[in-house]
Swiss-Prot record:
SMART domains: HhH1, TOPRIM. Residues 79-174 form the Toprim domain. Keywords: DNA damage, DNA recombination, DNA repair, Metal-binding, Zinc, Zinc-finger. This is Recombination protein RecR. The keyword Glycoprotein does not apply. The keyword Zinc-finger applies. It comes from Synechococcus sp. (strain JA-2-3B'a(2-13)) (Cyanobacteria bacterium Yellowstone B-Prime). One of its GO terms (molecular function) is zinc ion binding. InterPro entries: DNA_Rcmb_RecR (IPR000093), Hlx-hairpin-Hlx_DNA-bd_motif (IPR003583), Rcmb_RecR (IPR023627), Rcmb_RecR_Znf (IPR015967), TOPRIM_dom (IPR006171), TOPRIM_RecR (IPR034137). The gene is recR. SUPFAM superfamilies: Recombination protein RecR (SSF111304).
Length: 199
């Protein structure tokens, strides 16, 4: 149906999250209609991002610098941390412009069915960081799901011995069970942050 190079482009685009066959086809046809200079710029941007963007050694955010801009910022409140499952959730929290503390990205949620446990996430790094830096409050901005609940409680259990007085809270209302944090609008997230509850 398609010439081999076009079929290969469609196949590669389909590997991206949220891209089905029809969307991949539309994107591929759009891309081959663009001037060569635009395609070269896109390819160069992809390669540059892949070669230069790494995890921050402190919070595990994606960054071209280490530590990341958030961890380096003197305007951030080092006593207040937000624990998120993924960088997409960090970005969602930043869009609210309400959270002024630091972050810790776990790298996912505990999911025994998918073979994801404590050792596959940045939980031990969080425990060591809390013991070392002694924040006053940890806000869990974790999507309300079974995996999210399990992850929050496991992290809490790991932290209790090293930080027995650490206040641990979670986002409040506005996030229905099973929803993804990254898709919540800024107002809902800001209100959930403001009305956070003890964990």
């Amino acid at each position: 149906m398609y010439t081999r190079p076009l079929a290969r482009l469609i196949e590669e685009l389909q590997r991206l999250p949220g891209i089905g066959s029809k969307t991949a086809q539309r994107l591929a046809l759009h891309l081959i209609n663009r001037p060569a200079g635009e395609i070269e710029a896109l390819a160069k941007a992809l390669l540059e991002a892949k070669q230069t963007v790494r995890h921050c050694s402190i919070c595990f955010n994606w960054s071209a610098e280490d530590p990341c801009e958030i961890c380096r910022s003197p305007q951030r409140d080092p006593s207040l941390w937000c624990v998120v499952a993924d960088v997409k959730d960090l970005i969602a929290m930043e869009r609210t412009r309400e959270f002024k503390g630091l972050y810790h990205v776990l790298g996912g949620l505990i999911s025994p069915m998918n073979g994801i446990g404590v050792d596959q996430l940045h939980i031990r790094e969080l425990v060591a960081r809390v013991a070392r830096e002694k924040p006053q409050e940890l806000i869990f901005a974790i999507s309300p799901s079974v995996e999210g609940e399990v992850t929050m409680h496991v992290v809490k259990d790991y932290l209790k011995p090293v930080a027995p007085t650490l206040r641990m809270t979670r986002l409040a209302f506005g996030l229905p069970m099973g929803s993804e944090l990254e898709y919540a609008d800024e107002v809902t997230l800001a209100r959930a942050l403001e009305a956070r509850q003890e964990l």
